Amino acid sequence: MARNIPLERVRNIGIAAHIDAGKTTTTERILFYSGVIHKIGEVHEGNTVTDWMAQERERGITITAAAITTAWTRRDPENPTQPLPGALEHKINIIDTPGHVDFTIEVERSMRVLDGVITVLCSVGGVQPQTETVWRQANRYNVPRFIFVNKMDRTGANFYKVYSQVRDRLRANAVPIQLPIGAEDTLSGIVDLVGMKAYVYGNDIGTDIRVEEIPADMEELVQEYRAKLIEAVSETDDVLLEKYFGGEELTEAEIKAALRKGTVANTIVPMLCGSAFKNKGVQQMLDAVLDYLPSPLDIPPIKGLLPNGTEVERSADDSQPLSALAFKIMADPYGRLTFVRVYSGILQKGSYALNASKDKKERISRLIVLKADDRIEVDELRAGDLGAVVGLKDTFTGDTLCTEDSPVILESLFIPEPVISVAIEPKTKADLDKLSKALQSLSEEDPTFRVHVDQETNQTIIAGMGELHLEILVDRMLREFKVEANVGAPQVAYRETIRKAVNNVEGLYKRQTGGKGQYGHVVINLEPGEPGTGFEFVSKIVGGVVPKEYIGPAEQGMKERCESGVIAGYPLIDVKVTMVDGSYHDVDSSEMAFKIAGSLALREAAQKAQPVLLEPMMKVEVEVSGDFLGDVMGDLNARRGQIESMDNEGGVSKVTSRVPLAEMFGYATDIRSKTQGRGTFSMEFSHYEEVPRNVAETIIAKNKGNA
């Protein structure tokens, strides 16, 4: 079957930002103007298309990355409510992502599979902590983007302040290509710095847009920002640079081509403005998606590994062998949905694909594309497409689907570690099986949600990215799986590590009491690893002193010992083990004996290597009026916080600090009472840091039952 729309007219984009910047409203307007919906939904009314989970509609926040397909034809610059005569339709796949830090994995997995991003910023709040997190995630995957400064109709709106923040805090080469005409309740339109026109809105529903001369009182400002635009685009191309230095005018086509080149190369970040809620600037933003964000053909080929470890590239081409990345799992009444991005080749309904990550064959029984909760069945997904496969059994987030005769494994996703855990149990014994099924289903969907059983207490422990994250998952158990659960108090996800290296530590397991005995013997070196490496194992066994079949079990024993640590029962991380020697017995040695020997060696070595306790540190930003600043800072210090910076703007102080997560439980209530309800804060995971000795002693004693 031929492709309906050629790849150069396809855009895979995400809409990402800080919570409350207006992402979901912006998406709704895009869907309205592109004809997917015929009535605009509002977040505050709980009837938006992309927020389709019950909790999303109740809370007014986006939790899961909803994927939607729509289409857009470039507007006529002289008649902006109508398509440009002769312009061709483009297909746009949109992912609306959450802005709440507890759901950061949804942003992470979206960035991994997108070609471009619209970053929505609030014209009042500007760059917020979660904006910086989203920006870093986009940087990690080198995703081209532009900025839409939203809510220009709100009191306190300031486009130029946001422009400065983007350059200073995000260190981005932001280039405004539009300026607002007016602000707050006088917002009446936008100036297009590329076409040098003013678009003035006759109403708040986006159906009456007039093209006018640029207002006389803006002439100087427009010339200043037009000059910045021309300078920025000239630097993308030697020919344009020559024209610029020669004092020649650049044509509109040259400016657009250079802007596209700079945006795709991530050297320019265009800035647009408007008000999604008041329907101002949305059509122009959609034109910018077509003009400046890349098609699948514009991005570099995806890199992967062949089974022998050789690096290979796959480009966006239907004729190449299939390669697709699973980026999201979702439980659904129709069956388990596995969302995929097809990077090359064609994924066909009724065919078989190899899950190269697990080396298992999967049958592709049904393929669908989504319009939020509408599912449209399709026969195939081609290179550059986003869609979902129904009913895959062994494929999870980060796995690669390919053909058996051309296997490849694509780079997976970065999955952050959980920072908070709680014990959970069903309210009635009858619900035990249902709870187990619910936890399995939810952990398959969300790789940052972990479930394990505490070996000592036999309690089921769930771990996640924050209190809201776990609260919503428990809520989903009740709604979707009809399981009522009791949840314990939140616990901090402490970790253990070591501070010095130790060499030649032995682990000997010997049981010889007549008959077949047990014998395993290993010698290891243990040293601190790089932060974030977890557990690293190297074997330097030579000459067969330990047979190959026993090295794996010894490593497994060490890994399992790391899971329960050596000082307080928390996982031991960022260690490098080198197995240097050992011995075996022809009759008595076994895999189990070497597994136990490995565990004994690791425990002995870690106890000698100056083990320490680590705790998650959170980046906390508090905004408060000056009257309460002293109380807030005193409180942060009392919570073992480290104040990093303070800014004051318009009578509001912003305090940035790093505070241990253990000290932040209940902070939302405390700050409300300390500031009479006028203080706000945001918190996100920063890093792990060593726990002060006096605090560590209390935690260790408590875990040993001595507290």
UniProtKB/Swiss-Prot annotation:
HAMAP family attached to this UniProt entry: EF_G_EF_2_B (MF_00054_B)
Organism: Gloeobacter violaceus (strain ATCC 29082 / PCC 7421)
Domain of life of the native organism: Bacteria
Protein name: Elongation factor G
Protein family: Belongs to the TRAFAC class translation factor GTPase superfamily. Classic translation factor GTPase family. EF-G/EF-2 subfamily.
Function: Catalyzes the GTP-dependent ribosomal translocation step during translation elongation. During this step, the ribosome changes from the pre-translocational (PRE) to the post-translocational (POST) state as the newly formed A-site-bound peptidyl-tRNA and P-site-bound deacylated tRNA move to the P and E sites, respectively. Catalyzes the coordinated movement of the two tRNA molecules, the mRNA and conformational changes in the ribosome.
Alphabetical UniProt keywords: Cytoplasm, Elongation factor, GTP-binding, Nucleotide-binding, Protein biosynthesis
Transmembrane stretches, start-end: none
Lineage: Bacteria, Bacillati, Cyanobacteriota, Cyanophyceae, Gloeobacterales
Major subcellular site: cytoplasm
GO cellular component terms given for this protein: cytoplasm
